[in-house]
Amino acid sequence: MNKPVAPNSYKTGPDEEGMFGIFGGRFVAETLMPLILELQQAYETARNDPEFKAELNALSTFYAGRPSKLYYAEGLSKHLGGAKIYFKREDLNHTGSHKINNCLGQILLAKRMGKTRIIAETGAGQHGVASATVAARFGLPCIVYVGATDVERQKPNVFRMKLLGAEVKPVSAGNGTLKDAMNEALRDWVTNVEDTYYLIGTAAGPHPYPELVRDFQSVIGTEARQQILEQEGRLPDVIVAAVGGGSNAIGLFHPFLDDASVKIVGVEAGGRGLEGEEHCASMSAGRPGVLHGNRTYLLQNADGQILEGHSVSAGLDYPGVGPEHSWLKDSGRVDYVPILDNEALDAFQLCTRTEGIIPALESAHAIAQAVKMAPTMGKDKVMIVNLSGRGDKDVHTVGKLLGMDI
């Protein structure tokens, strides 16, 4: 197959219909279309309003703790014996992950639109916590849909949401994971369109969500680009991030897309291997289809039914991916690779012991790719890994898998 011709810029999408090439769009129930268009209009107005930008910037700085640091992971780099590895420390944000970046932007949008009720979906629980956090900060009721499987996997985060005043609704349909939680949230939205704002946590869903989530998360890459120029005097050779729905990854990637010298790698959940169905590598092993309002790469069976998938990481077990990632895969700009559960677990422990940093299992997938790549690169090469969240939420899962009683 011929490699596609590179566009003049990889940063111009989506078009006005929300398409990134053949991906994206607005495949929603008729009742939702007016709301989607209202949201798009509100976002267009807000993004061009200096007051909105100033308020978001102030909250990001004084509430969330931005900018997050770009940290030279010296212990890990020396252990691997190749490229210098830097961590973009999104784990240091308020609430412990990158999710707060998007939630602050969207809660300000909800306020502008006069919405009085917030709903959200969550897998790893980090988006649920961040949504409950911003709802508490602005005095709005918040309902968080969580797959029943994930309620069990993420007990500390479920308790945090409740502490913050959110109502947590377990979803037992399907496998009781992120896809099912998103289905329930969409059902809620359809029946409560007047007063409800759906605060989507990932760069998927109907347009304008993939675009606005990307824009709110792009602060990650914008900062990282500036920080690496200050610390190394040049751009990195490689940037790496884990991809579930893909918001932390697109946030890091987007500001680097037109830097041709920078190799970009997205890391999918390879689960127990791509041979069967126990993985969530939709771009490595899926094909295009429509889910949750957009056309993108999905895990499907021969009849087009969406597969449940599996990952040790609750935040990566989504059977699809944001449409911009699908386009970046097909355009050849970004390489997407799978990492197995056991590789992520090994990286989780290695990072903890060489750096004194406990990463989220999602981030551990990206670190596992760094473990593979860094030793093949020269010591003069530079890599940035997005440390998308901290791993406190995962210690019970990891303990169980390692046979330790916590």
From Swiss-Prot:
GO molecular function (one): tryptophan synthase activity
Keyword Amino-acid biosynthesis carried by entry: yes
Pfam annotation, one family: PALP
GO cellular component terms listed in the entry, alphabetical order: cytoplasm
Chain coiled-coil ranges: none
Record-listed N6-(pyridoxal phosphate)lysine modification sites: K99
Cofactor: pyridoxal 5'-phosphate
Keyword flag Lyase: yes
Domain of life: Bacteria
Reactions catalysed according to its record: (1S,2R)-1-C-(indol-3-yl)glycerol 3-phosphate + L-serine = D-glyceraldehyde 3-phosphate + L-tryptophan + H2O
UniProt-listed Enzyme Commission number(s): 4.2.1.20
Enzyme class of the recorded protein, top EC level: lyase
Disulfide-bond pairs as recorded: none
CDD domains linked to this entry: Trp-synth_B
UniProt cross-references to InterPro entries, sorted A to Z: Trp_synth_b_CS, Trp_synth_beta, Trp_synth_beta/beta-like, TrpB-like_PALP, TrpB-like_PALP_sf
Keywords of this entry: Amino-acid biosynthesis, Aromatic amino acid biosynthesis, Lyase, Pyridoxal phosphate, Tryptophan biosynthesis
Pathway: Amino-acid biosynthesis; L-tryptophan biosynthesis; L-tryptophan from chorismate: step 5/5
Subunit structure: Tetramer of two alpha and two beta chains.
Its job: The beta subunit is responsible for the synthesis of L-tryptophan from indole and L-serine.
Family as reported in the entry's similarity comment: Belongs to the TrpB family.
Protein name as catalogued: Tryptophan synthase beta chain
